[in-house]
């Protein structure tokens, strides 16, 4: 029996070796497919839903980045502090990712951080990592080993980019620094498809307050308009800062489609002037409402805070006229559209939900007028407009104490506003 087994192994051995692909051929084929996807991405737009959680230590303590990154170090000290959700559209232009709120069709040159304005974010999931690793930063690649994932045989490669070649920046909106980075990826040796990419920053000490940022990206092939494209399915970002706070960001991509009409896709800056200079805005020739006119709105649809996200559109009905002493500009019953720009659950200290709403347009008999307004409150007959740092004040903020994560803001919820000049006209 032992001799028979030995003969069988000797017979199968050459067959197994001959079936294996040369790792360098796999790497070359994968690179070609990845760059082909990058070159064709400007024609496509996807929606990404981003779920974020932040966990922070229950008390202050001192630890080095090396200690904080040890397996399970300090995990018992971390408590869930907050969570929120974003929904955006993402496209690629001039080898850069461009973003807009979902369905807005106006992509911002300033990028994801300027559009959202707060919290942990990463803008590499859709295409930037592709461009950096396989083209711009000229990463160094080495074959690691063959692995089996879900019954599927894959090749694992390692890669690295030193600081002097890196375009990877970490930090906050006010301070960002370049960092070395590296990681690994899994490739299908038969189809040359990229299956999973893992990217980690490499630094022995904190960079712009960040000890480590690690991202895992899962990819799949999508058939669109008689072509196959390698697109992200999901990304998972973990950030550990030097205070011990841990942020986790999960991004899921969906609804990928091609823009057949460039007239519907506007690439430009995020200023209100540029938005109004679009073809649609010029065709409608919108007027501008005078500032300092109070009005009241009610929601026409409920908001389920368990599923809603910043970026989602909302609809309201005007219940009071927008007028001054001599003229009525908009009558009650008009439809007002806007957008959630922040929806956050806070769990520690005083648990609450806070939602930020920005108004966009009012429909007056089929004519849409841009609506610039902010939350309006009155005390003792005197108007009070709270000063806030987020979003330039062109929004309303509403706080609900002690509510559950699936709290519903009911249809008919009343809000009070006052018109203002657009930010670009201040």
Task: Indicate residue ranges for each PLM-predicted region.
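Hydrophobic beta-strand positions
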Residues: 146, 186-187, 361-362
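Bacterial N-terminal signal peptides
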Residues: 4-14
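Glycine-rich, flexible loop segments associated with nucleotide phosphate handling
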Residues: 175-184, 354-357, 404
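Sec/Tat signal peptide C-region and signal peptidase I cleavage site
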Residues: 15-19
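Structured extracytoplasmic
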Residues: 20-181, 189-195, 200-291
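Contiguous beta-sheet cores, especially beta-hairpins with glycine/small-residue-rich turns
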Residues: 195-197, 201, 220, 284-426
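Active-site and channel-lining beta-strand-loop segments
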Residues: 182-188, 323-324
């Amino acid at each position: 029996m032992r001799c028979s087994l030995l003969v069988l192994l000797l017979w199968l051995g050459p067959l197994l070796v001959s079936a294996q692909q040369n790792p360098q051929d796999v790497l070359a084929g994968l690179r070609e497919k990845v760059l082909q996807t990058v070159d064709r991405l400007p024609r496509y737009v996807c929606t990404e839903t981003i779920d974020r959680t932040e966990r922070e230590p229950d008390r202050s303590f001192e630890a080095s980045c090396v200690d904080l990154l040890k397996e399970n170090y300090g995990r018992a000290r971390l408590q869930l502090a907050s969570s929120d959700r974003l929904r955006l559209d993402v496209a690629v232009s001039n080898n850069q990712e461009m973003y807009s709120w979902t369905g807005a069709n106006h992509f911002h040159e300033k990028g994801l951080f300027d559009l959202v304005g707060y919290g942990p974010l990463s803008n590499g999931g859709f295409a930037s990592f592709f461009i950096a690793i396989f083209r711009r930063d000229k990463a160094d690649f080495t074959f690691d080993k063959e692995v089996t994932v879900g019954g599927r045989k894959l090749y694992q490669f390692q890669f690295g980019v030193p600081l002097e070649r890196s375009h990877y920046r970490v930090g906050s909106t006010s301070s960002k620094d370049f960092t070395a980075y590296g990681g690994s990826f899994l490739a299908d040796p038969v189809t040359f498809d990229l299956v999973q990419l893992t990217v980690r920053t490499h630094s022995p000490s904190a960079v712009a307050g960040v000890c480590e940022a690690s991202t895992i990206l899962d990819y799949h092939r999508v058939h669109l308009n008689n072509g196959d494209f390698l697109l992200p399915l999901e990304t998972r970002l973990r950030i550990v800062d030097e205070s011990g706070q841990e942020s986790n960001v999960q991004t899921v991509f969906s609804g990928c489609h091609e823009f057949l009409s460039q007239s519907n896709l506007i690439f430009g800056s995020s200023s209100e002037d540029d938005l109004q200079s679009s073809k649609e805005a010029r065709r409608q020739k919108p007027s501008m409402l005078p500032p300092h006119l109070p009005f009241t709105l009610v929601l026409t649809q409920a908001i389920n805070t368990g599923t809603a996200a910043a970026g989602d559109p909302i609809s309201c009905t005007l219940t009071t006229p927008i007028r001054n002493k001599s003229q009525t500009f908009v009558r009650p019953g008009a439809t007002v559209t806007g957008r959630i720009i922040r929806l956050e659950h806070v769990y520690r200290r005083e648990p609450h939900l806070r939602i930020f709403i920005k108004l966009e347009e009012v429909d007056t008999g089929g004519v849409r007028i841009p609506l610039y307004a902010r939350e309006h409150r009155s005390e003792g007959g005197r108007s009070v407009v709270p000063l806030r740092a987020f979003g330039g004040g062109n929004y309303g903020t509403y706080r609900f104490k002690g509510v559950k994560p699936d709290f519903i803001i009911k249809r008919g919820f009343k809000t009070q506003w006052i018109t203002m000049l657009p930010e670009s006209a201040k």
